[in-house]
A protein has these predicted regions:
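Interfacial aromatic-anchored transmembrane helix boundaries in multi-pass membrane proteins
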Residues: 2-38
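Membrane-embedded alpha-helical hairpins and interfacial helices in multi-pass inner-membrane proteins
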Residues: 15-20, 35-124
Length: 124
């Protein structure tokens, strides 16, 4: 979703997708997905341990993606100046980590509250 969403947003602004960042969005999504697939939030349980794993996965994925992957791809694909892209990467990594943990965490928590727990329904 990150790959498609990022590419479509770039296109909707009337430009050409910035492929290094589109690829990084996909990388972050894959890493977070691999980390969090075993949390089983679809069962309606998002306890402190799961919140911690979710937060850690997002921070690790975003920091590696935006501080390493995106700047390196910017340099390789677009010949951008290293100092500029690594500075952008640090800002993006930190801001995306905070956003993903806070907004993403609240969305997952809200989602788990909508799920009926096993055995919570009585047969009449």
């Amino acid at each position: 979703i990150g790959f498609i969403g990022h590419a479509l947003i770039d296109l909707s602004w009337g430009g050409i997708p910035w492929w290094s960042w589109v690829i990084t969005s996909a990388f972050v999504g894959i890493v977070v997905g691999l980390f969090t697939q075993k949390l089983h939030v679809e069962e309606g349980n998002f306890n402190k341990k799961k919140v911690g794993v979710f937060a850690l996965a997002n921070v690790i994925a975003n920091l590696i993606g935006w501080i390493v992957v995106a700047p390196v791809l910017d340099i390789l694909i677009y010949a951008e100046p290293a100092k500029k892209v690594f500075a952008q990467g640090v800002f993006a990594g930190i801001s995306n980590s905070i956003t993903a943990v806070v907004v993403g965490g609240l969305l997952v928590l809200a989602y788990t509250k909508t799920i009926a727990k096993k055995g919570s329904l009585d047969k009449e």
